[in-house]
């Protein structure tokens, strides 16, 4: 990402990862204090890759902790995640990502 | 996102652009153009350290209502106020153009193509107009959209839906006014200069933007319905907007043309009559206009439920 | 030769002052508004203690303007004793040197200006109080010499109708008049006969019809459209883990979106939990518009109000079984009585705050704003004089582990004092901190104490999106701090939590996550709310609620 945005890359692996069902899934809106999540099924030997793009700097360690916790709770693997953030708080980050993963894990196909 | 059936009862006011786009057409028929996974986002925002969205705040695509191909444009007010920049503008232009091209192709193949199979465009507005971060590109997009709308005249009906938080203001107010049919909810707002800008330019005595009741009775759905700027008032659900849209699209193109506000000598004369009326009436408030339209106790209409309002409100005749 | 002692200096002085104003009256106690400034200049002396009525809701704004227009050569160094300083004119009075010293309770929008004036020496601070505390001092050492009050209606004899917004008026008028002080009222309307006598004419010396109705702030109106999913989640947690758990029937809700969410969850989630009739029956509470769905659904038996809320008048009048309605059919609020009810007769105070420190002390002050306290500390504390017993009070007392350290084996109840806060506010501003900003404010504004809204020893529960900390169950400060860390999420305070310790606290029921409470996070969204917009509230009230213009979006 060129310019002034902060780009972060993480890789996590949870203990008993399960693959997501949907090949790709989009969730959320980049409103103020909010974010969008893009999930893509991707062979990563059970790991999860996450790329975050955000105007916020100085909270990289918080991002790492929040994302690690959500991935570990969700027990998913083999998925590449992108997040476009606009000042979301950790609670919103965790909530949106968990919702996105839960939809992507469920067999019930949502509308798009 | 919720399932299509659940989306139908969702508040149109609270729905996201994508929810509105998916829910306005028949179940399972929506295909998005340049969606988030295509990652066509604004090249300008990162340079300014502003957050990006992979759809640039505009959902475009195609679906069906019955047999009719419906080209959908849906603006997302949560992302930079639904403002139109280079990418979101181009998506808007191209979507209308695709509808026009498809019409041309279908009709040249089959000149007697039934009305029910001819394409239409539906635009769900939620915007303050040009994105100031990329103003020139945004302005240019406005002009190109206008051009496409003109190009569709008498061929491809264009329906505007206005019932989202931000309303429809700025250059996009002009754009909406140039479409064939406008459907609003009572929570929708339509205007050119936004309330805050009027206050800034003309002073608080002229227009107090913090007086939301004033803002709504000047730009809101009920007022626009009474004065004829909007053709239909829908309830605040995706279902109601979809059903109203469906009903309008069952009408032949010639009839849809009659809903327009501008675009013919006759329409211009009607508008001039309205200007004359405003000069002679010198309204101090929209309530004066409502009263002139024949509503004896106009204030009582403000808090009425939609059904009561539709049953009682008298509309202005030029 | 011994001089005879004089015992009526105050009334003699008052008579002299009133005589000086004689020609300004047009009829009995009526003074035309153009004589407002002259009246104040006639009856006020430099150095007087003056009450200017105004709280977080109604404002005697015309009389404030008059005072601000007085000649500071004649009238200066006043000592203002007033509930609140929320209007720019309140500070102008100090800027012009008309007033010097201030004793108050609530800063509101002028909080930053108060801090600035303190630093610059334009304002000398007596103390920051709670409402009830300040009222108490009107009858002790801060009795006003002249009080400037406001009412809806007044008559020629000085009788006042303060109605829905009675608020602080009775306390001010009584304290002032019964120590021979002077009471001047601005009224929205001069009438032949007031609708109801809220303040007897004998207590009032002058009535002025103000050019504009007095200003009213709709401070307690929360637009349901702005309630977030997280607030819904925390509301569900509070309802199940606290309201339901303790069977809280008598309570106060603070201002804010958390409690607005709870109010709107009663008819939905509350019914689902089967709590109707078991919780939320009696309130000391302003007429919150977000209470309408719960009232209509039959949850509430009574509400006594500190003040009125703009737009709720007709609704309250149409529900006389719930609200306190006079023989004339209109409501009467009374801040002093409602605060007393809130202090002595409620089993729970629940509200939001800005910052909570690692010990559990909380404050709404920031380094540059003297926000004041309002009424929250009177309710957000354990009423030490309370002796009557209710089930929830007893239950919380029985849990209160640290009580035995001072009381031995003597049982005692405890009020539930609950703070709700997301771990981060907007822009990644943490709510849990090592040290409150209030410390910096104390330094910046030369305060003797850091202003604390609720002290840790009164706090029994914290609700965040991470979970509920049941602090009353903790043994000692160390354990309380661990429980606080356990719900402080990804703030520095939260990140210092020891996961093993938090796990032990969860096993002991001292920390409960939404999962521990059996709450499905995926259900925690706005669809749970009984009303999602102000229009929904209007419809739910059958058109009786008339929201202020700024809340209308149709």
From Swiss-Prot, chain A:
CC per GO annotation: cytoplasm
O-(phosphoribosyl dephospho-coenzyme A)serine PTM sites in chain numbering:
32
Q: Does the keyword Cytoplasm apply?
A: yes
PTM comment: the record says: Covalently binds the prosthetic group of malonate decarboxylase.
- Which family is this sequence assigned to? Belongs to the MdcC family.
Role according to the record: Subunit of malonate decarboxylase, it is an acyl carrier protein to which acetyl and malonyl thioester residues are bound via a 2'-(5''-phosphoribosyl)-3'-dephospho-CoA prosthetic group and turn over during the catalytic mechanism.
The name under which this protein is listed is: Malonate decarboxylase acyl carrier protein
Q: Which organism is it from?
A: Malonomonas rubra
Curated annotation (Swiss-Prot), chain B:
As recorded in UniProt, its EC number(s) are 2.1.3.10
Which positions fall inside the CoA carboxyltransferase N-terminal domain? 2-257
GO biological process terms, alphabetically, are:
carbohydrate metabolic process; fatty acid biosynthetic process; malonyl-CoA biosynthetic process
Give the disulfide map.
none
Family matches, as InterPro entries: AcCoA_carboxyl_beta, ClpP/crotonase-like_dom_sf, COA_CT_N, Malonate_beta
Leader sequence segment: none
Q: What SUPFAM superfamilies does this protein map onto? A: ClpP/crotonase (SSF52096)
Q: Name one GO molecular function term.
A: carboxy-lyase activity
Which reactions appear under catalytic activity for this entry?
N(6)-biotinyl-L-lysyl-[protein] + malonyl-[ACP] = N(6)-carboxybiotinyl-L-lysyl-[protein] + acetyl-[ACP]
Q: Which UniProt keywords apply?
A: Cytoplasm, Transferase
Q: What is its main location?
A: cytoplasm
Task: Say which enzyme class the record assigns.
Answer: transferase
Q: What cellular component GO annotations does this protein have? A: cytoplasm
Recorded protein name is Malonyl-S-ACP:biotin-protein carboxyltransferase MADC
Swiss-Prot record, chain C:
Which Pfam families does the UniProt entry name for this protein? Mal_decarbox_Al
Q: Give the UniProt entry's GO cellular component terms.
A: cytoplasm
Q: What domain of life does the UniProt record list for this protein's source?
A: Bacteria
Q: What does this protein do?
A: Alpha subunit of the biotin-independent and biotin-dependent malonate decarboxylase multienzyme complex (EC 4.1.1.88 and EC 7.2.4.4, respectively). Acts as an acyl-carrier protein (ACP) transferase component. This first step in malonate decarboxylation involves the exchange of an acetyl thioester residue bound to the activated ACP subunit for a malonyl thioester residue. Has a weak activity with acetyl-CoA as substrate.
Q: Which gene encodes it?
A: madA
Q: Show the catalytic activity.
A: acetyl-[ACP] + malonate = malonyl-[ACP] + acetate
For this protein, what is any one GO molecular function term? transferase activity
Write the record's keywords in alphabetical order, separated by commas: Cytoplasm, Transferase
* PANTHER family per UniProt: ACETATE COA-TRANSFERASE YDIF (PTHR43293), MALONATE DECARBOXYLASE ALPHA SUBUNIT (PTHR43293:SF2)
Task: Provide the protein's localization.
Answer: Cytoplasm
Biophysicochemical property: pH dependence: Optimum pH is 5.5.
What does the record give as EC number? 2.3.1.187
Annotated source species:
Malonomonas rubra
Its chief place of residence is cytoplasm
The taxonomy runs: Bacteria, Pseudomonadati, Thermodesulfobacteriota, Desulfuromonadia, Desulfuromonadales
Recorded protein name is: Acetyl-S-ACP:malonate ACP transferase
